[in-house]
């Protein structure tokens, strides 16, 4: 099974202005080619599956990250030259974005690809309105995430899901031989990851209905911290949080979570608990229940279907 790295790409836009006569025409280098869609002439089973998925769901379907691999000529020695375009799931148009890279193991059996599509249609897509569906899905067997600093790649995690601007990648090796319970649990985790990212990307004004309740505490130290699990969680609950602050997988006492972590915690709560369950569990912490209701409404407004 081949492994591929998706590297962080530096995107530079270069604009050259030259004088043109009325007879001059402008033509892009490879006009009107949709790299996410299988070609109209493709008749193999994988291409047919991809195209059918797009027409049925509105999202493109990929099974590897290579969008383009075409010969563009030869060099002086006669060696073929290729133009390559890779899908960079982690690419974000922001200079301060955390740099990450992903290593994929591809699905190689058509039956596994079909199973992945069935999983999407059965457990994921029914919950996602048009605004929440990604531009494309990249279905693979396994994902390994790396952080990148000064061109040094450090192992980070093996996520089930990687959410990007142009694609959401899903690792489906866990589905091999899985029963309905495992399918549902896997789908729940994927939906939490996907929706946490979608919510965090919303404008501050839209998020304010949720963030206003704990905004003054985000990523700040507790005024009078406690250094045991129970007392630390009391500090969190009193400020409207349902989890503590973690860094590199370790819990830090006396520090409040970040906004993004708070969003992820409440997205999970909104997707997995009923109002009655939350009201009972956090009966002494009305701010938590209010934030739960605000998050459910946010998700509904974005098009989530409970």
Question: Where on the chain are the PLM-derived regions?
Answer:
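Metalloprotease/metallohydrolase-associated module, dominated by Zn2+-dependent proteases
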Residues: 216-306
């Amino acid at each position: 099974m081949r492994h591929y790295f998706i590297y962080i790409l530096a995107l530079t836009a270069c604009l050259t202005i030259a004088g043109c006569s009325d007879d001059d025409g402008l033509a892009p280098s490879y006009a009107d080619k949709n790299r996410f869609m299988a070609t109209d002439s493709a008749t193999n089973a994988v291409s047919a599956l991809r195209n059918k998925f797009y027409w049925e769901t509105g999202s493109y379907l990929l099974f590897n990250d290579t969008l383009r691999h075409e010969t563009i000529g030869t060099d002086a020695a006669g060696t073929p030259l290729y133009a390559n375009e890779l899908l960079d799931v982690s690419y974000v148009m922001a200079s301060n974005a955390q740099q990450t890279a992903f290593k994929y193991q591809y699905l190689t059996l058509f039956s596994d690809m079909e199973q992945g599509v069935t999983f999407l249609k059965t457990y994921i897509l029914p919950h996602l309105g048009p605004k929440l569906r990604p531009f494309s899905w990249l279905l693979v067997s396994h994902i390994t995430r790396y952080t990148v600093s000064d061109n040094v790649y450090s192992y980070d995690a093996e996520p089930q899901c990687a959410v990007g601007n142009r694609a959401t990648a899903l690792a489906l090796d866990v589905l091999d031989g899985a029963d309905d319970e495992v399918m549902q649990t896997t789908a729940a985790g994927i939906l939490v990851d996907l929706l946490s990212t979608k919510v965090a990307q919303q404008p501050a004004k839209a998020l304010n209905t949720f963030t206003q309740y704990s905004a003054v505490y985000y990523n700040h130290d507790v005024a009078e911290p406690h250094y045991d699990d129970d007392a630390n969680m009391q500090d969190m609950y009193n400020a409207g949080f349902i989890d503590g602050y973690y860094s590199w997988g370790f819990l830090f006492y006396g520090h409040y979570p970040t906004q993004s972590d708070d969003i992820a915690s409440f997205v999970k709560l909104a997707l997995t608990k009923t109002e009655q369950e939350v009201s009972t569990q956090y009966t002494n912490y009305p701010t938590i229940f209010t934030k739960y209701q605000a998050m459910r409404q946010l998700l509904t407004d974005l098009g989530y279907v409970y």
